[in-house]
Design a protein with these regions (language model features):
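Glycine/small-residue-rich hydrophobic helix-like segments
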Residues: 215-226, 230-241
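Beta-propeller blade signature
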Residues: 31-38, 104-114, 168-174, 227-234, ...
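Surface loop/turn signatures of beta-propeller and other carbohydrate-active proteins
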Residues: 1-11, 39-79, 115-148, 176-207, ...
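Hydrophobic core segments of beta-strands in well-ordered, beta-rich domains
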Residues: 3-24, 32, 44-47, 63-101, ...
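Phosphate-binding glycine-rich loops and adjacent basic patches that engage nucleotide phosphates
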Residues: 28-31, 107-109, 130-133, 165-168, ...
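Short active-site-adjacent helix-start/loop capping segments
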Residues: 25-28, 56
Length: 297
């Protein structure tokens, strides 16, 4: 199955690239595909495979928290080089043999070409074993989202206490050493009966004219739904209680159970937003879906 799409561009290459994960019953590996039109994707190959046995990323590697040149919502998703390398934070798991076997970790990867990735640090950047790990995240750390703003790096990540997931924030001055924000979680769960009652996860943050917007997924009301939150300071967020897109929105049934884990791109050719997401149907089949802000041919 496939999951966790993230679309980006690399200087000197035409078109777009997308990383995603493939699950082979043992764990996650990250793959990359190419597209000229944001609809048809081909040239699939491995981007980053399993880490060494006994280490924090042996059971799974989930690329997608890239260092971009610009985080404006309409900017090209162009990767930014730092000292000759592109960088991505990544989610990881230490054990093979199943789906997201806890506890999860986060690492940092680097690449010279944006296609093939390797570890940039041999220890995790976030772990449940670190001294500043909070109660809300004590059981598992999941997927990061990297943002650079005014010389600082922000990592919006989801984590779990039991079966409850929320979004927290870690900060860094160099990409390699991170400290958690003292008032985590920054996007907590909603009240009973809300669309994010159980999960507020997988935040993707962009600048939109005069404020920041986070696209995340909530779990509640018998499904996973694409939701949004807003802030001006990156710390204090206001959640829109009504989903942007609800599970079951596609009449084919491909997202009848979950619609989550988005990647957003503005296509100037047709002046439309393209939002990729992980679609899960009623029997658990996973794949990558696409919704757009305007009809496309």
């Amino acid at each position: 199955m496939t999951d966790v799409p993230t679309v980006f561009q690399v200087k000197g290459r035409d078109g777009w690239l997308m990383t995603y994960i493939g699950f082979d019953s043992q764990g996650y590996q990250s793959f990359v595909a190419e597209s000229k039109d944001l609809v048809q994707w081909d040239k699939h190959r491995l981007a980053m495979g399993y880490g060494p046995e006994g280490e924090f990323d042996h059971g799974g590697v989930v690329l997608g928290a890239y260092l971009y040149k610009d985080y404006d919502i309409k900017a090209p998703r162009m990767l930014k080089k730092k000292k000759g390398y592109y960088y991505s934070l990544y989610g990881s798991y230490p054990r093979q043999g199943g789906y997201e076997l806890r506890p999860g970790y986060e690492g940092i990867a680097m690449s010279k070409d944006g296609i093939t990735w390797e570890r940039a640090k041999n220890e995790p950047i976030l772990s449940v074993h670190q001294e500043d790990c909070g109660t809300w995240e004590k059981d598992c750390i999941y997927q990061p989202w990297l943002l650079e703003h005014k010389g600082r790096y922000y990592n919006f990540y989801n984590a779990a206490n039991g079966h409850i997931e929320q979004t927290g924030l870690a900060l860094s001055d160099n990409l390699f050493e991170w400290s958690r924000y003292i008032n985590n979680p920054v996007i907590p769960n909603g009240p009973e009966g809300s669309f994010n009652e159980k999960f507020s996860s997988d935040s993707k943050v962009f600048w939109d004219k005069d404020h920041w917007v986070s696209f995340f997924f909530g779990v509640g009301q018998k499904g996973a739904h694409i939701m949004v939150a807003f802030t001006r300071d990156l710390y204090n967020w206001t959640v829109d209680p009504e989903p942007l897109y609800k599970a079951g929105g596609n009449p084919s049934g491909i997202d009848g159970r979950y619609a989550h884990k988005i990647s957003l791109v503005w296509n100037p050719a047709d002046e439309s937003y393209y939002m990729y997401y992980c679609a899960v149907d009623s029997i658990g089949t996973r794949g990558i879906g696409l919704i757009t802000s305007e009809p496309i041919n």
